[in-house]
Amino acid sequence: LDQSALVSLMVELFTAIRLVSAYPAPAVLPEVHSFPQSEMRRRLCEGRPCSIKAYYHPDWGVVIDETLDVHHDPFDRSILLHELVHHLQKTTGKFEVVASFCSRRMAEELEAYEIQNRYLSKANTSRRALFMGSTGKCADADEAFRAQAHSQPKGD
């Protein structure tokens, strides 16, 4: 990814997020990395086939599938925007008051999809992002899972 074009795009996307939500612009832009789908599968799906196109991790930033055309395709750009919403959720601490990990995760995803679809609507594109629910195990009582989940990236 061309870094200067990427920074410009992120500033544009954070402005769009601010216009369709109550989030402020971030003090620091997250890092964005582009990986092949095979690397995404290795990192997130233990090598099994999966359809994750991007994810956010508070320590690593945003990781996107290298096949996404975030500079020219409005829907692909909205996928990056969705992950940038997760960055804002984390840096503002908006959902930290939700005690249940599962409830917090669901609320974060629902909001990110809502903002993504508002963005797509304003971009005058007919495509919309669909939230199909959580595909993984989520049990608040399972302490081992919760500890592991906090160190796992968010993928959509």
Question: Model segments located where?
Answer:
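Auxiliary, metal-adjacent structural segments of Zn-dependent hydrolase domains
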Residues: L1-V63, D69-V70
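Extracellular/mature segments of secreted proteins
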Residues: C50-P58, E109-A112, S121, F145-H150
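Substrate-binding clefts and substrate-entry loops adjacent to catalytic sites
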Residues: I64-H71, K90-S103
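Post-HExxH zinc-binding segment in Zn-dependent metallohydrolases
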Residues: A99-T135
